[in-house]
From Swiss-Prot:
The gene is lin-15B. The lineage of its organism: Eukaryota, Metazoa, Ecdysozoa, Nematoda, Chromadorea. Synthetic multivulva (synMuv) class B protein. SynMuv proteins are required to repress the induction of vulval development. Acts redundantly with SynMuv class A protein lin-15A to negatively regulate vulval development. Regulates let-23 basal activity. Residues 1317-1329, 1418-1430 bind DNA. A zinc finger (THAP-type) spans 1135-1209. The proteins lin-15A and lin-15B are produced from a single precursor mRNA with non-overlapping transcripts where lin-15B is the upstream transcript and lin-15A is the downstream one. The precursor mRNA is cleaved at the polyadenylation site and a 22-nucleotide SL2 leader sequence is trans-spliced to the 5'-end of lin-15A to allow its translation. InterPro entries: Lin-15B-like, RNaseH-like_sf, THAP_Znf. It comes from Caenorhabditis elegans. This is Protein lin-15B. Residues 757-767 have a biased composition (Polar residues). Keywords: Developmental protein, Differentiation, DNA-binding, Metal-binding, Repeat, Sexual differentiation, Zinc, Zinc-finger.
Amino acid sequence: MQTLKTARLTSNPASIPTSSSSSAISAAAIQKTLDAVNRPPAVRASGILRHRTLPAPTQETAHHLDADPKTTELMARFFISQGIPFECAHEPAFLELMKHVDPNCVIPPTNVTKKLVDKISTSSKPQVNYTKTVGPLSVTIDICGDEDEKYLAFSIHYFEDLYERKNAIYLRKLLLTELDSNSLLTNIRRSVNSYSFSNVKFTNIVCPNEEICKLVEESAVVKRYNVCFYNYVTRFVADLMEIEEFSSGLTQLRTFVRYMKQNSDMYSKFRRMQLQKNAELDIPSIDSGDWHSTAIFLTRCLVWHDTFTEFCGKLDILHYIDNETFNHLIYLQRLLQQCMKHCRELSIPNNSISQVVPAIMSIRNFIASNSMGYRFQKRIRDSFTTSFKEITSGPSQDRYDIATLLDPRFAYRDTVYTAQTWRSLEKKVIDDFVNSDLQNDKNFYQDISILNQEQRYDIIKKEFAYYRQTSFVERPEENENSNHWWGMRQTDMEFLAVIAREYLASPAVSIDAGYYFGNGGKFQHICHTYSHQRLENCLALAGNYQTFRGKGASVDVISQSMIETLNNTASRLQKQVHLGLYAHGVDNISSDRDVQSIVGHHYPPMPTVANYDIPHVPKEEEKPPVANLQSTSSPATSSPTIIRPRAAPPPRTLAQGRPIPLNGKELKAVPIRQIPLQVRPLPPRPANVPIVPRPTVPQQFIKAPAPKPITLQAVVCSIPEKEIKKETEDVALLEKIKDEPLDEDDFNHPSTDPVPNRTTASSQGPSSYPRKIVVLASKLPTSQSSSPSTATSAQARSHVTTAQLIRCGPSEGTVPQKIHSHNFVQKFAQKQNFVHKYALNSQDHTGRLNQTVPMRAALRLPNSEQKSGAPSSINGKVQRDDFKLEPLDDFNGEPDYDNLIGAQRLMYSDNLNDASAEDAFARHRVTMEFQKRRACNRRCAVCGHLEIHERLKNVTIENEKLLIMLGCIYRGEFTLGQAQLFMARESKTYICRLHFLETLDEIYQMLRLKSADDILICPLDLIQNALITVSALRPHIIASQLRKILHDFAERNNHLRETPAELKKLGQQYFDYREPEPEPERNDVDEQEIIPKLFRQPRKQVLEADQHDGTVKVIEQEDFKLPTVKPSENEECDNPGVCCFCSKRGDRGGMLRVPRSEERLARWVDKLGPEFEARLHTNTENLICRSHFPDAAFSSRGRLLKGMIPDAAPEKVETTYIIQGNNFLKLKERKSGTDKNSAIDLANMLNPDGVEYTQEEEEEEEYEEMSRSPTEETSDDEPSQAAVYNNAPVIKRTYRKRELSNEDGPLNLVTPPAHTPNPRGRPRKYPKNSVTPEAEKSLTDYDYNPGTSQRRALKKGYVQLEDGEIVGEDCEYVPEKTPSGRLIRQAVARRSFAFADEEEEEEEYEESPIVKKPKIAGRPVGRPRKDANKLPTPTPPSNE
């Protein structure tokens, strides 16, 4: 019997594939075979098994699947373009990806992929088709590697069309490490055309550095050689890294980071501190490689500066940077960030050489505008000039400048070059085109060899004119492609577009070989994996799929949040290091809270200082006076004071006040006028006011030294005498001077003269002005003396027995304010009454202000102008109008030139009492309510003269100050040191407008000019001579900038040189600003016709044609008249006021005060007319409603802006007429600003009585009226109609309403003939007048109502005679007949009643005899109406 075992042995097992089978069998077939072999046997029933033959299993055929050729090719191209080896195709992660994309995809073997790559690289065609290129051919090269292996990367740039430049990338491995120009250029030329490479030549080549440029410049293959822009920037940054402040700071940062990473204990503590704050844990990586990594490392460390400082403070780590080093490094970081920004912009694929010059100018402007006064800034400027001198002043300068000119993104921009430079560059391009050789002529599409030089000049000149206009109007953005811009305008500028493509084709930077073959490069791995031949094939294929990446390209890892953190940290630390410059003169900063309040506030940037490398000066150094303002006895030699950029200035206080500490601040006290207090009662003194004891009685006080007087003979003689203000002539004018401690010090010339009653007064010089004097005793040692000054060293001492505050001088009221001559102002001169800024009020509202205030005060000298007979007694009382307290201002600038007259030295006591603090608080509240200041005269910062505010200018432009100082130095009025001090002052600079004319004259004389435009063409040596002096004041200014500054100043102030004679030549009236009256236009229309109004010259009317041809709109504009409101429109309020514009009575809160200055008041009166001037009051304040101004006339705080005038638009009346023949028919009339209008219905021409007439009836009626015999029977007592009209004068078109009175004499009115009443007559109401009974009989209720044409003629002043003729003063009316027998109404001439002004009409009317046109009852001519008998007989009006 056969057992199960033997049955199994006799079975034929399934065939297993041998190892020699192809590896291309799919994984599914292999898995299916293995499952068939390992399948378990079938379960059989127990018992004897019979022998039977089992059928053999069917063998599955193994299919050898091949990969898709297209899939293999695409996979090979992708792997090699990214520098990935082919073996990565069988990685599990990639297989899983492919199985997810396509489960049936077959991955090709590695050897198949390598063979495919070799085949593609050997059979591929060149990327650049040299025969089909358009325009120039450019190439950039770069070499990377070490001494053993070197790799070459180059890019070829060409044009296939006119709109875009193509870029082709090539990657090669060099066989020899020693470079040879012939082999290098041959390799590049074979890439373009491998068969005839000797014909390939390049227009431009960009080399990575000077060494390679010198290597290939000997060849004749290239026309122009350029060096990569990134090389110049790298050279500049390398010089920056060698600066001691920068290198030491970077070394400290690297040492600290290495220490943190090497010490595990420190690093764990740092991480725990960051975890508590939920902040970032990683420490910045140390830089390695180029300066890009250094900039990123520096940025991240500075962002972490506060964290590192806190950590070092907790663990007492000393080797970290301090705040001053941080300020130095933040300056370096911002400069490196600017360099990275421009390198990143110039490394894009479509970059051009035209972007180089704007990038350099941007970096230079950043250095000039961020001058912080550091010592190393001069070295930075020198390094910048040295690094970029080959571009800005080398042999390749013209190539870069012309490329910038032909780039529409930067052409003709003032930020790049001046207008004169752009014109000179245009001239160079024109000369090159006119004088081009035959080789360059082939570049153009047309044959220009047949054109002569004049024709070429005209062509290129016209194209430049069109380009200059188009580049301004259609300027592209900086990120757009300039080649596309030129391609779109090829037809408009045919020759100039070819020249522009020739210059713009060259890239600004070379290709970056380090990106491909450097450390961590894209192809670094395959370079060390494959052999030379296999690597060469891979690189040849990989270059076809690369985009151009220039040197300097980097990823911007500096986020906006990092920049904000840096700015906030820099702002705070800048104020901590230079706290004195931001403390606003407060010298008692003792607590950390005060420091934080100053540091935490927003701060302005540090001042720009001219002298950067000058050492500090001791504080006792005196300020040199102006040479011309010194007396003859003063020494002529004076060393210039050196500017200290970081030194905190000494604390300064007001010249007429004293500092009063209150709540941690110092308040200042200045004299205040008597002001009517219209505020709520002052609250009680707060509880937190400190109480301090009264000072003890001092034994003596110290008098301030007297400076040397100034003689008027030392004033500059070049100033015209009419412009010099002599302060000694009018003492009353000097009383109007406002003490302005905010801008300038208060100086005088005291002399020691005894004054009775224990005080010392000084007799002031002729140039001093009176002021209120405050003397307060101070407890000082006897040996103490005042600070040094320019005055004599002798100091008089006096004794005071009580510590009281006295007020020496006149106690008059408010100082009068001067208003210059005007019609309105003359009223004040006649009444000898001046306008006060605040009305005087004798009520006492100040509370405790009249108590004794023995507080800390400045030691001042008595006023010498007080009366000698009025001794200054110490009464211990403070007048309520003596002082006003304000927060202390910022005096962080250098001393002004004001102290040339002499500065008062101030002495203080050390104690306060409770009464003084309470009074200070009360006065401070009063000051806050009245912030407005008095109109004042100011002192010129140059000459020291006192002028009114209108004759001074607050100079805020730095260039204007520079040129004014330049003129003063050339005239010998200022020394160089004094000019440096003037440029360093930070307070407001008020300068006489006369100095601008003097400076302009000095510029004209210095540069030998005739006009302002001559500055652009003046010789360079004259500019260089002026630059020597300017460089001492502002070292960063170059010659081109100085030329532009001079030109702008001359253009802005050239009107000061124009004389009245020159202005008259220009047609302007210098003394009378009224424009000349235009000549009346003549009317040349034929006199045989009646001229319609459409062709007449309107009087104060504007004709506007409507859309329809038959209508005309007439806008009558009347003169502006001030509105007058009705009494019902007035408002009832608690605080009423009357508007002088509309006479409306309303709340004062909604009104403004009318300005009182001469200039503004004159403009208002000129605009609003004499009626507005008549409404102004002299003794009370004048108000005007806020509603009379537009919304734009007010500032954000609700104040009226200077120069704003109320709306004074004249009223307009719009009337629309329809033209029918020669007649105008009025349709509607509307007044501006109202809804009132009048209109008639032309379709229904109804008469006043309601009867409708057709056109034929009207003409027939007019025919009968004019053809009828005028000889009607009249009574003997009643004259005829013709007699009445012949005796009446011609009345003008405009009649004035005039009451009839007996004073005018008897009226010569004659009763008209008695006719049948005309039904169409209109009743007229006559005014009640005192007339004679005879005149009353002649008046009727009906007017004379002739025909249509006659009515129109009579309205215009014509008179109808007895024979039917209608005549005027200079014309007659002649009726003519039509072919049908009807008359034609036509006049021989017309009478024009247009007058130039309404006032002329009134005057002429008054001259004519007053004869009223008679009222004629009924119609003298024409047929009577059918219903005439139905009307009642009219009766004359009664006397009621």
